[in-house]
Amino acid sequence: MTLLVKGGRVVNPAMQQDEICDILIENGKIKEVGANLSADGAEIFDASGLVVAPGFIDMHVHLRQPGQSGKETIETGTKAAAAGGITRVATMPNTKPVIDSAIIVDGMKYKIEREAKVKVEIIGAISKGLQGQELAGMGAMAKEGVAAFSDDGRYVENCDFMRKAMEYASMFHKVIIDHCEEQSLVEGGNMHEGVVSNELGIKGRPAVAEDIAVARDIFLAEATHTPVHIAHISTKNAVELVRQAKKRGVQVTAEVTPQHLIFTDEVLRTFETRYKVNPPIRSEEHRAACVAGLQDGTIDAVVTDHAPHEWEEKDQEFNLAPSGFVGLETSVGAMLTYMYHTGNIDLMTLVNAMSTAQAKILGLDAGVIAPGKDADLTVLDLDKEWTVDSSKFYSKGKASPFDEMIFKGKAAATIVNGKIVMKNGEVL
């Protein structure tokens, strides 16, 4: 199959390329990038007036399989990704059973091959059962092709255990991803600890819990000369810790979510559970620090932490509702509306954070538009105005902090291995 993407503005951070050109695709691979390309019998995709970027990646997603198909499935989650312009996701291991062995990884690969609409990377657990007591079968999972290791949802408390995990993962050239909240400080907390939580009478999760955990991981990475990736960073001090560590040459990377860049804990005054997430949406000083971290490259990646729940779970008293909400179908619109169109970040920075940088962190041969590479592309309409309607999401999860908001900018098409899997909002 031959596809010719014509006349788009190609924004390609790996090449520092930002120009109008064509992309010729044959048999799932990029054959040529240049001006005035042609090919007999090719399907033409007119990208005039649109941005063509390397396929967007979301390295922090919960597809909820195995074991929680009421919340999400590989099929529904990857349809949501395609609808949102995401060509590849990495799914976290806090499932039932936990993805902590080669056998479970192999079963996941079988389902992914048959059900996924976009590419799916698997993240294996650091510890058996996410208990932080015994290392999971990391070597065997690495051989099965997992992209990274994480006990996401839980902080790896034991320092010596984490040190060993970092050293072991590095033997297989895999990165450790850590959910950084010191558990004794956040136990029972339901929102950011601060003025708003005090006024509402809700037990908070203090910023210092993240600061301590991030500092610990940075020092361990520095001591072991191994990489560590900080999941969903959300505090001012944590951002500064990463900034200074990078200056010292520590192999630390960090991600942030749209919700931590856009909202503050003031939205929690409504007691709406669609804003409840861990780490919590924080105060303005923390939000602004995250934006500054993305601007100067301290924060490498923008991810969703897409965490669907059944509606009955979220539709209950605030303190009882689980944390997490969906994000795959809104991340592009949210980032274009509140970060790009506001002048907070330029388009090259946005594309890098949502594609190229994530490929680099996970060691993937992706995130670049160049001959010989897989033809994974995200096509953006920067000026498309639309209203978020969670009832129409492909995801099973319908709780979204962005519901009913008006966005400017949307994914116009998603191309995976040279095949158009989404066009104008419809997953094909």
Enumerate the predicted regions with their spans.
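Divalent metal-coordination and catalytic microenvironments
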Residues: G8, I23, G28, G49, ...
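C-terminal cap of metal-dependent C-N hydrolases
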Residues: E317-L320, H341, D374-L428
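Histidine/acidic residue-rich metal-binding segments in metalloenzymes
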Residues: Q133-V302
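His/Asp/Glu-enriched, well-ordered alpha-helical/loop segment
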Residues: E199-P227, R274, Q295-D296, D300-V302, ...
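Active-site mouth loops of central-metabolism enzymes
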Residues: M59-E72, E121-E134, K203-A207
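Histidine-rich, glycine-flanked metal-binding segment
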Residues: M1-P54
